[in-house]
Amino acid sequence: MHVLNILWVVFGIGLMLVLNLKFKINSMVALLVAALSVGMLAGMDLMSLLHTMKAGFGNTLGELAIIVVFGAVIGKLMVDSGAAHQIAHTLLARLGLRYVQLSVIIIGLIFGLAMFYEVAFIMLAPLVIVIAAEAKIPFLKLAIPAVAAATTAHSLFPPQPGPVALVNAYGADMGMVYIYGVLVTIPSVICAGLILPKFLGNLERPTPSFLKADQPVDMNNLPSFGVSILVPLIPAIIMISTTIANIWLVKDTPAWEVVNFIGSSPIAMFIAMVVAFVLFGTARGHDMQWVMNAFESAVKSIAMVILIIGAGGVLKQTIIDTGIGDTIGMLMSHGNISPYIMAWLITVLIRLATGQGVVSAMTAAGIISAAILDPATGQLVGVNPALLVLATAAGSNTLTHINDASFWLFKGYFDLSVKDTLKTWGLLELVNSVVGLIIVLIISMVA
């Protein structure tokens, strides 16, 4: 019966795509119809299905909704105050277009390493859109390399939760994960961020409406470059500082609680938003009504994106509750292939099925560890644990689709169709993942 659930999941995903692409049904409605179909076909009783839907919607949006809203407000204030224009103009004037691409990759790597991915994306998106507008190039030509860098850093490197969990599961040396991770990251980002866009054809898309200034920007009253770049960096500064402070702080002490409260994603974003109220608003001579108008405009514009992300969470949770992850793991564990490829493949399949990066990685880690662990020594046999971490992490950073919140975040923020999102977000993640595995295999042969 569990094997049959794979068929129901495929049917549900196909149904959503048909409703959205052929019949032009709103993505939120199509996702909910797909979730209901999968749950009922998989034999879930109606009350369990109702609980799953509420859990999927609530758990997905619990923290993410706050992050998305605060990030959208910061982005709107950056545009309306001219801060985004100041950043774009300064970078292009000093670096030129060639090095601007490199700069957004570096910023993406830093944000992806320091923040949860959703926070990193929300901070990156308005920057790359305005820089691209200033350079008169399609914004996706900068968005793709920036996002490729952020997702790679987020997936491969501690202190992000997925890599940390894998390091613990495999007993890997964290220093070697960083060293090998750099070797994996560079070609992955080059291929997904710089080479892939050359093969994607026309990337020209209109600027998302909520990132257009409601009124002409006063070019004589722009924030300085330093102030303009400081605000989007505030969450990264706070979170990096928290990570460093935790090296010395004792867990559950008052000092630890205060630092980790401030360093949590919602609070760090809230602090950045309040600073934006001042530095992009009142400090530039705008009254509080001007600031609140920007706030309300951003919230209204991002509302549908949030609802669609929540509906995607419903489908994801419904799929997870069918037990499909365990089914895929059981089927794959009977193969006789390289542990690196096996770890990557199991993670990819479960990620595709469930939309859960950390869950897919940890499921693969459990299966692989059981297969190659020496019970006498407690050590993995015949593999490099650090490379196994990276192979599994690369599998979690792969092609995703309608059951993944990040898919809908990319689609909604950049105002793309489902088809265009699969072509851009989907392919950049797939290239990232495949190149990552290839580099891991090459290192395993020479290290």
UniProtKB/Swiss-Prot annotation:
Pfam family, one: GntP_permease
InterPro entries referenced in this protein's UniProt entry, alphabetically: Glcn_transporter
Chief location of this protein within or outside the cell: membrane
Involved pathway(s): Carbohydrate acid metabolism; D-gluconate degradation
Keyword Lipoprotein annotated: no
Keywords: Cell inner membrane, Cell membrane, Gluconate utilization, Membrane, Sugar transport, Transmembrane, Transmembrane helix, Transport
TM region(s), chain numbering: 1-21, 29-49, 55-75, 104-124, 127-147, 176-196, 225-245, 261-281, 295-315, 330-350, 352-372, 375-395, 427-447
Membrane topology note: Multi-pass membrane protein
Example of a GO cellular component annotation carried by this entry: plasma membrane
Subcellular location: Cell inner membrane
Family according to the record: Belongs to the GntP permease family.
PANTHER family with a match to the protein in the record: GNT FAMILY GLUCONATE TRANSPORTER (PTHR30354), HIGH-AFFINITY GLUCONATE TRANSPORTER (PTHR30354:SF20)
Function comment: High-affinity gluconate transporter with fairly broad specificity, including low affinity for glucuronate, several disaccharides, and some hexoses, but not glucose.
Name used for this protein in its record: High-affinity gluconate transporter
Gene designation: gntP
